[in-house]
């Protein structure tokens, strides 16, 4: 949960590093919480050596299977030369689109191997991944403005999506409140 707190307060992905078996299974609650609240986390778990996977070895568990429902994506690293690209991809998946947790499971024999580090390829961000993208059609936005005008007691109820959308979204919301004078309320996830 500390990594989740870090991610919530910093806007950067939190990182979790745990051992195999019980270390990995003890992350399920935090991963589920982060998944439900769209908090970017990268969880790196240990695993028994590759040749022991599936043999009920000491502290072996199906980490990727257990965490599939509570992560955006997970990986079992079977080749040391793919580790760097998987880690770069993990951070990308955790922080793009709807943010959320991902998991990288690294068997013990892979942890002790030497491999070649490969820098990530330059990824051109899609419009909206770093800046706010307005998807509304002009007529829909005009309809919302008209509803604001006609409302006798307008109130803005905003959620965690504003926080997750970044500082620019928060700034725009503050400007809207300042311009309109509308009262605003948020659930705990939207307080930032």
Regions found by a protein language model. Give the residues of each.
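N-terminal alpha/beta PP-like core and its mobile active-site loop of ThDP/TPP-dependent enzymes
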Residues: 1-192
């Amino acid at each position: 949960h500390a990594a989740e707190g870090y991610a919530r307060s910093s806007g950067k992905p939190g990182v979790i590093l745990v051992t195999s078996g019980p270390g990995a299974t003890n992350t399920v609650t935090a991963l589920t919480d982060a998944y439900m609240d769209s908090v970017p986390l990268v969880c790196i778990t240990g695993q028994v050596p590759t040749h022991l996977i599936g043999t009920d070895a000491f502290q072996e568990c199906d980490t990727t299977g257990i965490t599939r429902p509570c992560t955006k994506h997970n990986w079992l690293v079977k080749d040391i030369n793919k580790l760097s690209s998987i880690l770069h991809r993990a951070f990308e998946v955790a922080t793009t689109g709807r943010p959320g947790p991902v998991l990288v499971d690294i068997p013990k024999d892979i942890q002790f191997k030497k491999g070649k580090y490969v820098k990530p390829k330059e990824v051109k961000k899609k419009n909206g991944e770093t800046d706010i993208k307005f998807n509304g059609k002009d007529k829909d936005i005009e309809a919302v403005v008209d509803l604001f005008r006609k409302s006798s007691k307008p109130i803005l109820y905003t959620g965690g999506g504003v926080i997750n959308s970044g500082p620019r979204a928060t700034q725009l919301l503050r400007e809207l409140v300042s311009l309109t004078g509308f009262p605003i309320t948020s659930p705990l996830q939207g307080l930032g």
